[in-house]
């Protein structure tokens, strides 16, 4: 499971790579883990079309949300707090049928989660070694995700998101990571040229075409060194 990732390092990357403005929220941290705030990119409509004119083009917006999806059927904020840490990764193969993710998938609530790298454990030594996975060229990744909006009976509102994953059993790099004996998974990293097509896919089955493993030669993995305590 990929439950921790690193946000973008520089504001200009949001505009240059993802065509959105950088977040104005200065409280966002560089590391994101379950129930922490992060950002995602989704489509927003410019407005209703006027008769006789072309329909408005979809524009992108950057949204701050909680990492860990909160399905709309959750009964209370307390229930959401318990469930969301377990709902950070959605299997692409079952997103359309899962009770947790079906509404977002079928409702075209697709998003892109920008990140510099994500963390996974390497268990080949017999113990978990946190490892940083990034692009070889150092550019940001755009990971396919789903978003949701939950409204509580007391007026509470939680905007949340999760990351989609694909099978990595035969992936030249990512098959090394994850618990021994378990299916290997990796995040659904999108090609840069596919960002718009993913967000604008006309129906769920078309969106499924983007659920592919990113090429191993485009990724690099390095163990994360533990910080030494000050003398």
Model-predicted segments: where are they?
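Short linear sequence motif anchored by a di-proline
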Residues: 1-231
């Amino acid at each position: 499971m990929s439950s921790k990732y690193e946000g973008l390092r520089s504001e200009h990357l949001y505009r240059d790579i993802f065509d959105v403005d950088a977040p104005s929220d200065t409280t966002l941290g560089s590391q994101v883990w379950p129930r922490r705030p992060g950002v995602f990119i989704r489509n927003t409509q410019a407005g209703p079309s006027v008769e006789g004119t072309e329909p408005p083009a979809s524009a992108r917006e950057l949204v701050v949300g909680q990492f860990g999806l909160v399905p709309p059927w959750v009964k209370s904020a307390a229930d959401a707090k318990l469930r969301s840490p377990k709902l950070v990764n959605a299997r692409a193969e079952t997103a359309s049928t899962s009770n947790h993710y079906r509404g977002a998938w079928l409702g075209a609530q697709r998003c892109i989660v920008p990140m510099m790298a994500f963390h996974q454990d390497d268990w080949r030594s017999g113990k978990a070694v946190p490892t940083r996975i990034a692009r070889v060229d150092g550019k940001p990744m755009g990971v396919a995700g789903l978003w949701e909006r939950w409204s509580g009976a007391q007026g509470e509102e939680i905007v949340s998101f999760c990351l989609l994953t694909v099978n990595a059993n035969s992936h030249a790099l990512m098959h090394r990571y994850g618990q021994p004996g378990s299916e290997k998974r990796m995040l659904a990293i999108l090609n840069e040229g596919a960002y718009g097509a993913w967000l604008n896919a006309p129906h769920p089955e078309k969106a499924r075409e983007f659920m592919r493993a990113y090429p191993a030669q485009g990724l690099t993995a390095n163990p994360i060194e533990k910080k030494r305590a000050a003398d």
